[in-house]
Each structure stands twice: as C-alpha cells, then as structure tokens.
C-alpha cells in the first residue's frame, strides 16, 4: 500500500518527483492530459474539496528530524527539500536582527539556504545529478537538525513559521503560504472523488491506496521479490499463488522470470519438463477460454473447478422455469449479457474514466499521424474503445512484443469484441472500430508513420484496462444485480450458464488431468461470494420450484406493508427483495439461537444486504451512498426478522 511512509519507494517518489530513484518502479503518467498535473502525482486522499480541507486546518505543516512534511490526519507526506527554503527564509530578517548578521547560527542557516537553492531540480534524471541531489539533501538534513538542536532561537523561528503557515481558521488569506508550498510539490492533493477521472498512476483495480508497480523492469522485479525469494530459499514456502495475474504487463514473461530464478536458486529434482517452482495463478477463464499452455505454471487457483462442481447441483432443465419466475417476481426481463455490457460501461464511467480518457487521447494522437485517420474525433475514438472494452468477451488478451503476429486466440477475441461493438453502435462510423482493431492486431500499414512502439504502448494500456473493467463490472456489479439464482453468481462463474451435466463434468476433468493435473481443486476461497453450504442450499431451489414460487409470493404479500416509498419508488425494490429471500434460504442457521445470537445473525444479514445493494449500484453505491434507500432496506429487514408476536414470516 502507499498510504504510509513505510513504503519508502512511494515516499521517495512524492519527495523527488520524476527524478526519484524509484520513479520508474511505478506506472505514473508524468505528462497527463491535465497540464496542471505535469510532473505531479494526483493524490485523491481528501475527504472534501481541497480548499475546504486546507482552510479547516486539516492539512498541517510539521518540522521533523531535519526536514519538513505535511500531515492529513494519519497520512504523512514529504515536502521537496527545495521547497523548505520558503519556510526557513520567512521572517529571516527578524531573526538576523535578534542574533546579529555575524552570528554563527545565522551564517549556518544562510549556508543551508544556499545549499537548498543549488539542489538539482526534481525533473533532472541524469544519474550523476540525481545522486548529487540525494547526497546534498542528506547533508542539509543533518546540518538543519544540528542547527535547530544547538540554537533555541532558530528552533523558535522554525516553529513560529510553521505555525504561521498552518493559518488561522476563518481567515482565508492566512492559508495562502501553505497553499503555495503545496503547489510546489511533486504531488497534487485532491478529493477522493477526483480519482475516477484524473488519477495518473495505475492502481490495483480502482483502489487508490494500491499503486501498481512495473515488474516488467528487471530491477523492479528483483527488488520487489527480495522477501518472497528469501522465504522460498529458506523453505518456509514451497510455491506461490499469483494474485490477479492479468494485471501484469506481460504475465507469461513474469512467470518465466519466476521460474528462471527458481531454476538458478532452488535446485531440485523435477519430473520431466515440470517447472522448477510450483506456481498457481489466479486466472478467471471466460467461456471456452483455456489457460495458455506456454505459461510455466501448475494451473489455476481453482475457480474453474469450483464452478464446474457447483453446476452439478443445479437442475439445468429448470432454467426457463426459473427465468420466468424471476422475471415475474421483479416485473422485468434482464438478459444477463446485456446487463454485463451495461455494468462494464458503468464502471468505466464511474470508477475508471481516467483510464478510458488516457486510451482515447492515445488513440487521438496516433490517428493524427496519418491523413487517413486524422478526421476521427477524440470523442468518437474514446467512445469506440469504451464500447470495445464493454464487449470484450474475456478478461484480457496477451499480445506481446516478441511475436510477429497475434495468436489466433487473441485475434479472435479482438475481432469478436469489435464486431459486437459495431452491432451495438450502428450510428458510429465503423471505420473507427476498424482502426482500433487493426491497431490492436498490429495490422496498420507501416507507411502511416505508426511504429511498433506506438502500437505496443497502446496495446499494453488497453490490456491492463480490460481486466479490471471486467472484474469490477461483472463480479462486483452484475453479480449483485442479476439475482435469478444467486448460487451461480460466483467468482469465475457464468450466471447465464444454468447447471452442468455429469458427462460435461467428466469431460472437463479428463481435459484437466491431461493438461493441468496439479491445478487447484477449490470449492471456496477468500474471494468467493458464498460458502459451499450456502450455495448448496440455494442450488436446490430449481428442484423445489413450485414450492419456492408459492413461498416467495406469500412472503411478498406478507411483507409488502414493510416497503416504504423513497423518491416515489418502493424500497427495497423487487430485485433486492428476491436477493434477500434467497440469502435467508442459504444462510438461515440450523440450530436454535438465543436472543444474542439471533441479533448477531440479523445484523449480519443487514450488513450483507447493504453491501450487496451498494455493489449493485442501482439505488446506492460505495461512492454515493443513498441513506434513505439503505434505511428503508434496513427497516424492511428488521421488520421481517422481528421476533414480535404476530409476525407470520
């Protein structure tokens, strides 16, 4: 994480900007679309607008151990050494009058100010200049710390200046100095709401506190794996589980790097061509998708097996009947594929619009280089790439620089996504979609002026965007909206695929034994939405369809009085109510509960339902909670699960 000074790499980048030693470790766009962010990192950590937070004295300047920093509650951020000069020189004339111009402390302070003015700028990336900046900064820190320790007048001078910089609440102008100081930094503080549109560093999905690192760089790979390699060398662990492998620049190359290290450092007997290190990857496979055979791994973390087994316990022949029941109860038909498409677009609009803006501007710059494409507008290019990602059938493609042509698998996914996007957008010029398709596949005429590097730069960004959009759009949105049979809404699963036959299961297991015999056979993980027991209960509902139909009809009649109007609509809506009833069927305890345990159970159901409706993003969300809808939902749950006399539920 990057939320504390413990991450010395990130701290270094915030202090030293693009010229930091560790700047290359992070995927930061130092020349983003917004000019005010040039050579800066956007830090969307504030709870309110920047100006409001500043004038509420929530951002505080501090002196600490020979340097200065700012704090925002528990967050601590470094200040660039060159910016310390403004703090130290403020009211310097008064200090000189107090001590005299020839005083040793004054001469030392002036010498420190001179040293700060000669520090190489943060934009400087020449290795010798960078080394000089770090060396001289260290010397200045020690000198300043010693001066403040030895001279109480200088100490008082610094503390008084810090107090002045921190402003006076109610006097807006008193914060001008702190504002100017913050504007000099290699970061820009902003409200958390700004992140979705303007963040300029790659993250783990849309989690601002988890900055992505560039493991494709050899030095970053080696440094970031130092602890992991020590654990493996000591025999504390004998294998690795690679989380979110699709977020990597080039998953196959990364896995090869791991195995190359293991082959050199962990000599051991191997069976045939088996890799040196046992590695499982968290790879969510789409319908018909296979784990790439070229990856040096033992298999996946088992989501594919989990859903294969779960499907055995769902009556496939009851799909149409359960679909009709669901449609009738909620009062509308919800085709799953359309819902996924809309959910992915919602994520791109609400959580990841900055990534889409970057892709759109990349396309625009590339199209401007050729007269055949220059008339494609920025808006239409951004629209096209958004639609292609929304229609992308799997998490990502694996186009790389070391292949002359894309693999058939990747080409098929891209062609399919573009074809679907065209069908959904008949009013958008089809040539724009063709341009994006040919750029992704490396089929543009070299005479256009587009280089291989141009193509790879765009493809890389595209491939590292499709995965997070799929994950957030499907697992964290559509799975909470499409409630036909919620036991099928599992990580790596496809709720539109209603059950599996025994024959299909055995065929899949035979293929698994032949291709990936050591792949994990998981039935639940830390990421699953529900435990095996909850899924098993809900899986039975298609077998009890008539009883289930009568039960929910009866419950809906009984509980209709507990629904309330929120913005002229009943709350909770019928879809959330259907989810609630299935959740109770799956989670209702088998043992008798005393009053305390029952209250704990009701509270857990209540919290789960709040989480579910926020993930669904239909009436409320994590970004913009709707207190009235959530309160109505909680009242509904509490009323239904009340132990009062006369509650027939």
Question: Where are the regions that the model predicts?
Answer:
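Catalytic domains of carbohydrate-active enzymes, especially glycoside hydrolases
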Residues: 226-240
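Extended, charge-enriched "interface" segments that sit outside catalytic cores
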Residues: 117-159, 415-423, 433-436, 444-455, ...
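Acidic/aromatic-lined carbohydrate-recognition and catalytic surfaces
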Residues: 1-196, 234, 244-322
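Active-site cores of enzymes that catalyze phosphoryl transfer or operate on phosphate-rich substrates
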Residues: 149-228, 321-355, 359, 525
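Conserved, mostly hydrophobic/aromatic
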Residues: 240-243, 279, 393, 526, ...
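Polyanionic (Asp/Glu-rich) segments that form extended negatively charged tracts
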Residues: 251, 256, 260-263, 277, ...
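Structural preference for long, well-ordered alpha-helical segments in enzyme cores
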Residues: 224-227, 254-258, 580
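Structured core elements
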Residues: 239-241, 280, 521-522, 580
